[in-house]
Amino acid sequence: GLVGSEMCIRDRLMDPATGNVTAKGLCERIGLDGRLTHKVPATGKKVEKDIPMPTHKEAIEAVMAILVDPADGVIKSVDEIDAVGHRVLHGGDKFVESCIIDEACKQAIRDCIPLGPLHNPANLMGIEACEKAMPGKPQVAVFDTAFHMTMPPKAYRYAIPTKYYTEDHLRRYGFHGTSHRFVSKRCIELMGGVENAHRVIVCHLGNGSSLSAVKDGKCQDTSMG
């Protein structure tokens, strides 16, 4: 799985059968001097390297190289990777769930660049670099905004002239959706209930923070714009 932003990429290699993380890493300072950190949880091994990364393309290439490195890698070939998941910041109101990446999906991500100018271009570069490195492998886009697309108009519309919504797509979209989805479902599981019989307030606390109100497993409101 890949999580990309303007100057960094986080990666996880997972065993789909167990959910265990086989390797994880971070490429940072993309566009500057570049630095790669690679960790193998099973052994505690940690590798840090300074690697030129002019763009996200070179960062993806560095990730692939360390994964198959004879000394530091955990797989023999990228052919062992079954699929790639990408966390994509902004899906606008086009996506209500994750989707298999095809040309239409990539164009929709491009169309949302005005809404996510720092992250969406980086997400696209990561997707296209993976397509080149692993042609034919399925790739999935997981949108940060998708979980919040169940909000009613009274929650996502602002008290501003309608033209700003219809022409400029100015509305509440919400973020941290993957976190809010997971936490709300896990909360209901721990309470021993069923998804359609609970109201939950979810707090995402990290480098950015947000709250969401979830009813019957669907987002009703969120604090981010």
Where are these regions (language model features)?
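Short, small-residue-biased leader/transition segments that mark boundaries at the very start
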Residues: 2-8
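Short glycine-rich, Thr/Ser-proximal phosphate-binding strand/loop in the N-terminal lobe
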Residues: 9-53
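A structured beta-alpha segment of the ubiquitous adenosine-cofactor-binding alpha/beta core
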Residues: 45-77
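General beta-strand structural signal in soluble alpha/beta enzymes
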Residues: 86, 117-120, 138-143, 201-203, ...
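Flexible, glycine/proline-enriched loop segments at strand-loop-helix junctions
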Residues: 109-120, 137, 166-177
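Glycine-rich phosphate-binding loop of actin/hexokinase-like ATP-binding domains
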Residues: 147-225
